[in-house]
Amino acid sequence: MAVEFFRADHERLQNHEDCLDLLRRMDAAMDQDQVAGETTFAMALVTTEEIIVASVGDSGIWLIPATGNWINLTVHQQRKPMIGSGDAKPAALRYPRFEGTLLLATDGLLKYTSADRIVETCRGQPANTAAQSLTELVKYPSGNYPDDVTLILMPL
């Protein structure tokens, strides 16, 4: 339900207040739905001048520059309550746009491997290759994963 809600309304997003409003309305709608559960949600609005992130839950958004330290853009988000609880507390922040790679990922990646391995994997290879390599970092020898792994890599 969260994805459908986002798809129906994403074109009107212009600033961090719009992003917060979307997540609040999504939370209220999912809370009223008898079938919908709770979910984490992380989104990034990238313009020519800035990156706006809005999130709730344990997914994260990182900026990985070509060199130097990575930046956790969702460091101030609330882990719980999640979207669909009716009590979610979304956080939205604005950052100047940097050169590098933007990573949006679930905790299935962020929790089960080190930041150093993630950053090293993202640097020096095309985004599609890096994305496949990132999923391999957390795969068990059996081929299973410890948790769901969803990620988006966006070169900036």
Region locations from a protein language model:
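PP2C/PPM-type serine/threonine phosphatase catalytic domain
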Residues: M1-L156
